[in-house]
Amino acid sequence: EERTTEAQTHEDGSLVKRQNAVSVSDDVKIKTYSGTSLIEIGNRIMEPYGNAYKNMKNYADALNRLKAEMPNTKAYCLMAPTAIEFYAPSKYNTGVSKSQYEGMCYIYEQLKDITPVNAYAEMAAHTDEYLYFRSDHHWTTLGAYYAYRTFAKVAGFTPVDKNTLQTGKLSPSLGLFYTDTKSTALSND
């Protein structure tokens, strides 16, 4: 299946549209561990995603209430797309809208006096890089860097060049999903 993943942004970082495609595998295993469904595709395990608009509205309302308590503070909101948005067939996302992109846009539209930081386009542009741990739901430091770079642009400062940063690797790095599944496909994350 081809998934549309890359997005264009306006100068302020707001999303214009999704437009690029990434090939994803249909070789999928779905299992439940500790009451949570997990989707295994190749050497990656991910949680399914579903837009629950009531929950998204509650989240945006909570941010708006917090901002109202701090009227003189500049506030930002960065919603993080998860690996399943880019690396799984869309049929494994659930809800009214199966798109995290649409869910993020919905939340951003609800915000009052809070600047959205839409890192989606930046993440989508780098899906061929190691942005997400294969055995956990978190970003790698590289994925976090790209989100930071988007934040810097929106906040009006120059980000540190990633080539000036020291990198390293903790081995072995086995995340939450490996703990749940003991999948040998994840043993080298």
Set out the residue ranges of the language-model regions.
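Extracellular glycan-modifying ectodomains
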Residues: 1-189
